[in-house]
């Protein structure tokens, strides 16, 4: 019997495996795809957020601040590309300034280091390629960028070297609680038993949870489309550039990458399952919206478009832990 079965090997499952590999446990990862980091982890904005957006007192507020600092340590330890470039949230009209003030107050309450409000002049001095209509910004120097797939791969490699078993192309198809504790998992590679299960299945986490009991949370898979631009555009901005967030997320961002490119996106479109298709409508929206922040981006230097699907929860916080009706089953 396994001590711990981890379902999913994106960055969350990889991090769980990495930490557990430091203990004398029999741990195995079950990844449905043919390699790790093959879903949301390989197709996202690659941002480590500073922690000013979550409501104070939430898990997200605490773990954003702790996580960006911890990720810096882990990336250095594992030789993963990482750059603490800081972020700017722009106010593009006077009406958006109160929202920046709210984010600033959140950041102070959450303990975000070095956070401050900037005037239009200060903002343009830091980023001269921004739209001249910018009226202010929120600066968070602790925000960073990373290579998310290399991050997940590095943690998985260490975990496997430390004895964690990795089963790729191994989809969990059913799960049931056993009478004497633990869970029996039916996979495409046979049946296994585990004392504890960590559900890190990303957009499929609700479906996986419902194998053992009805989920108390709901996930809406949400597609985001991106432009990746040539390195000739990589210095167009030096910080992660956000627009004021809305109910769909943090909006369309413009950011350097750790490999010297420029990334622009995403939009936010609810989809069924893992639909990662790009659309002319979505890409036009991303382009037009991004130009409100950085009008001089040369989209003729685009070298690739891609889309990723992220798990949008119906609660404004991370889900970490087990429910009373499913002891030993831990959702991440």
Q: Model-predicted segments: where are they?
A:
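Glycine-rich FAD pyrophosphate-binding loop
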Residues: 22-42
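Helical element adjacent to the flavin cofactor pocket in flavoenzyme catalytic cores
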Residues: 138-196
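N-terminal Rossmann-like FAD-binding beta1-loop-alpha1 element of flavoenzymes
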Residues: 2-28
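Flavin (primarily FAD) binding-site architecture
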Residues: 199-214
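Short beta-strand to alpha-helix junction loop
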Residues: 62-65, 90-99, 138-157, 167, ...
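C-terminal catalytic lobe of FAD-dependent flavoproteins
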Residues: 249, 258-259, 274-332
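Dinucleotide-binding Rossmann-like beta1-alpha1 core, especially the glycine-rich loop
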Residues: 46-126, 135, 251-252
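Mid-domain catalytic core of redox enzymes
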Residues: 213, 225, 231-262, 268, ...
């Amino acid at each position: 019997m396994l001590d711990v079965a981890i379902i999913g090997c994106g960055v969350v499952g990889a991090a769980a495996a990495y930490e557990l590999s430091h203990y004398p446990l029999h741990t195995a990862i079950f990844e449905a795809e043919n390699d790790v980091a093959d879903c949301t982890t390989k197709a996202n904005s690659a941002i480590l957020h500073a922690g000013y957006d979550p409501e104070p007192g939430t898990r997200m507020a605490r773990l954003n601040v702790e996580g960006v600092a911890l990720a810096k340590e882990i990336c250095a330890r594992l030789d993963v590309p990482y750059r603490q470039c800081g972020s700017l949230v722009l106010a593009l009209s006077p009406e958006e300034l109160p929202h920046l003030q709210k984010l600033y107050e959140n950041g102070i309450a959450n303990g975000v280091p070095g956070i401050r409000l900037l005037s239009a002049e200060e903002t343009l001095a830091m980023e001269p390629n921004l739209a001249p209509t910018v009226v202010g910004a929120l600066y968070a120097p602790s925000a960073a960028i990373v290579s998310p797939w290399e991050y997940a791969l590095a943690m998985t490699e260490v975990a496997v070297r430390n004895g964690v078993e990795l089963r790729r192309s191994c989809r969990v198809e059913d799960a049931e609680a056993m009478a004497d504790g633990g869970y029996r998992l039916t996979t495409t590679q046979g049946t296994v038993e585990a004392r504890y299960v960590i559900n890190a299945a990303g957009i499929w986490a609700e479906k996986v949870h419902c194998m053992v009991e009805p989920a108390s949370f709901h996930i809406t898979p949400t597609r985001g489309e991106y432009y990746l631009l040539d390195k000739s555009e990589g210095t167009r901005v030096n910080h992660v550039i956000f627009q004021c967030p809305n109910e769909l997320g943090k909006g369309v961002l413009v950011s350097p990458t750790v490999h010297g490119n420029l990334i622009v996106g995403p939009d936010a479109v609810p989809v069924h399952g893992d639909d990662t298709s790009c659309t002319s409508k979505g890409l036009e929206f991303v382009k037009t919206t991004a130009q409100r922040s950085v009008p001089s981006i040369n989209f003729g230097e685009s070298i690739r478009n891609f889309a990723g699907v992220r798990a949008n929860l119906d609660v404004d916080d991370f889900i970490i832990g087990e429910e009373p009706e499913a002891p030993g089953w831990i959702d991440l």
